[in-house]
Amino acid sequence: MNLTITKEQLLNGLQAVQNVVSSRTTLPILSNVLVRAENNRLEFTATDLDVTVACSVEATVKKGGATTIPVKKLFSITRELSSTEIDLEVDEKNVCSIRSGSSFYKINGLAAEEFPPINAFKDDKKVTVAQEKLKAMMKKTSFAISTDEARYVLNGIFMSLKEHKMTIVATDGRRLALTDEEVDISDKSQGEFIIPAKAVNELNRLLSDKGDVTIRYAENQAEFSLKDDKGFSVVIVTKLIEGNYPNYRQVIPAEAKERVSLPREEFLHALKRAEIMTSEKANSVKLAFGKNNLAITANSPEVGEARESIAVNYKGKEMAIAFNPKYMIDPLNALSNDEVFIELIDELSPGVLKINGPFLYVVMPMRLS
């Protein structure tokens, strides 16, 4: 294998795939990136056996071939090189020579044949959406994924492709985030599946504001193929979480008794300030709604007290409810709307956060002290 590539292209390719590589693997091959050169493209593939990321970039290929190289070493060397052009050459013993300006390095690799194979997907179940759309949907929901490994089916996002609508849901049992968008879905591509958190994190990192993403899925795997207008392409293949996702519709409260309109930014920063005065033992903030006013208080015997007041649009009865501040801050951080709405039934029933758009967030209240 022999090729010339710019430092920028080499870094782009390595940055796209290296996050999936585990530093604690017992299999040396999984610390390596598979590098394949052909047709003036250089393809990088990395995997932890659950999630695989492949990326293709432009290069001047003089002689094609494939090998595997320790990804952290290759990335660290490339990042520190001062020249913008790099020559890579790999011999029959999988030793990779790197030349750039006055720098020369050799890295010992492993044979490409040792790298785990990647399943090829058929086109039977697939849907294509704008990357920007999927990126926004992921951002609005993924913060609510459960980290409790005992509830395995909640350790990812639920994706439903039905009746020309893509619905994405995440919940940890104490809160639930849901968003949906109109999408063109053929009859044979309809279905639903659970994408694990690690693949969701990779998608959040790699989805851009341009180009499309094609989603293909089978019984236990899904593939996300990303392409932008600059010829940069990434493929993420992930195992799916097995099991039945809970019926999330039944936790969405019926019609609310009270509805309040709030300025998102002001509400967010008031909550962030109040959260400073909470503690492990007293980790709630109280929201007291009066006519066109919201009073936010946090009280912790070992820390102190916080009081905030903001103007809101509210004409209902006086009402107070308490929440874990993090569970309100997370969705407000993920949204970009100027205005948000909170719908309430009473102090013991879940609150619902909404926007003027396809998004809904249900959060369990805490006991008022």
PLM-predicted stretches and their roles:
Residues 1-369:
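Structural preference for solvent-exposed beta-strand-turn elements
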